[in-house]
């Protein structure tokens, strides 16, 4: 059991109907915690909340309260935080996607910067103990191809990256000025069940899985040699709960921490992993699943992304339980079982 989870606390999870948020809500309820969820359904899905309720007992489900609320609504968020009086906030709400931010930078700013500072300010007014918030590996920008270390940043390559970096700065300022404990988690390419495969801004793994399971063609932006540190959702849930529970003396407090696996997978390797596991589950030959088409690299994409997770290990006790292949195997089994 993670330290601090033996006593019941009240947790506010923003983006509760989203991919990561819904997994956090589920694990907190399974641990007997009181959870308040917030989402405006701009990208979150009501289906995810139904899945959470179906995964926990009625007794545990009664510990969950949900509010449809937009974090950009300053007064609304302030009132909700004041009313719920959470001990901890896990802030996952954001408008994700680099391409989306390039198409519509103002909406990304409103959700990721204005919405986040609304949450920070509501938290400090009520006296919330700690805010753990989702940042992104995109803040590293053009730093280079080596393992990314928290204190070395390059130039931001997209409005999305800029919004996440601004959020980190605000969190640290609120820590220094008001004493609000914050921990930022720089996620590296999170994947897992409940990740939406639909729409123009869908992440690569759910999009590819949905297409390949139907033996439809897929595309790689670039020549396939680009690499990412893909991190399974179970690892990310662990990181959030650890960040919420470590002592106030931890070096992670008022800082940012890389959350990945510390290993890279090229996009072509990812394709082969998916093809192999999909073929195994559906009972077909690997070569029956089409090879990907190659398309030009998208604006704002970086060629390589790898997390140095030594600070996460030292400051949080973080230890990834799932490798990329273990996560892919679990994900494919889960997703294709739904359509069997």
Where are these regions (language model features)?
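Short beta-strand->alpha-helix junction loop in the catalytic core
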Residues: 192-194
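Hydrophobic alpha-helix immediately C-terminal to the catalytic Tyr-X-X-X-Lys motif of short-chain
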Residues: 166, 170, 174, 204, ...
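Residue-level signature of the cytosolic catalytic core of signaling kinases
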Residues: 69, 73, 197-201, 263, ...
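N-terminal Rossmann-like NAD(P)+-binding domain of SDR-like oxidoreductases, especially those catalyzing
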Residues: 1-190, 244, 335, 340
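C-terminal substrate-binding subdomain of Rossmann-fold SDR/epimerase-dehydratase oxidoreductases
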Residues: 10, 212-340
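The catalytic Tyr-centered alpha-helix of NAD(P)H-dependent dehydrogenases
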Residues: 152, 156-163, 187, 197, ...
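Short glycine/proline- and charge-enriched loop/turn segments
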Residues: 146-155, 203, 293-296, 309
């Amino acid at each position: 059991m993670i330290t601090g989870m033996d006593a019941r606390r009240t947790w506010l999870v923003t983006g509760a109907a989203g991919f990561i948020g819904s997994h956090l809500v589920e694990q907190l309820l399974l641990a007997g915690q009181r959870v308040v969820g917030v989402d405006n359904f701009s990208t979150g899905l009501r289906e995810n909340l139904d899945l959470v309720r179906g995964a926990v007992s009625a007794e545990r489900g009664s510990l969950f309260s949900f509010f449809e609320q937009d974090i950009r609504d300053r007064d609304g968020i302030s009132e909700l935080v004041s009313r719920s009086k959470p001990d901890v906030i896990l802030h996952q709400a954001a408008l994700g996607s680099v391409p989306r931010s390039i198409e519509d930078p103002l909406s990304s700013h409103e959700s990721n910067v204005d919405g986040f500072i609304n949450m920070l300010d509501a938290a400090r007014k009520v006296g919330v103990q700690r805010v753990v918030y989702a940042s992104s590996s995109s803040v590293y920008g053009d730093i280079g191809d080596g393992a990314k270390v928290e204190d070395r940043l390059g130039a931001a390559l997209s409005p999305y990256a800029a919004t996440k970096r601004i959020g980190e700065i605000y969190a640290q300022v609120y820590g220094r000025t008001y004493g609000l404990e914050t921990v930022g988690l720089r996620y590296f390419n999170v994947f897992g069940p409940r990740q939406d495969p639909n729409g123009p801004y869908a992440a690569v793994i759910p999009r590819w899985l949905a297409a390949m399971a139907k033996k439809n063609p897929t595309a790689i932006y670039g020549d396939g040699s680009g690499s990412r540190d893909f991190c399974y959702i179970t690892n990310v849930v662990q990181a959030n709960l650890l960040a919420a529970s470590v002592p106030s003396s931890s070096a992670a407090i008022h800082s940012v921490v890389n959350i990945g696996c510390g290993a890279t997978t090229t996009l072509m390797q990812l394709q082969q992993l998916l093809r192999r596991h999909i073929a195994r589950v559906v009972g077909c030959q690997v070569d029956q699943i089409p090879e990907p088409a190659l398309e030009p690299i998208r604006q704002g994409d970086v060629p390589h992304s790898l997390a140095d997770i030594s600070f996460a290990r030292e400051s949080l006790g973080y230890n990834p339980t799932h490798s990329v292949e273990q996560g892919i195997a679990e994900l494919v089994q889960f997703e294709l079982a739904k359509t069997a």
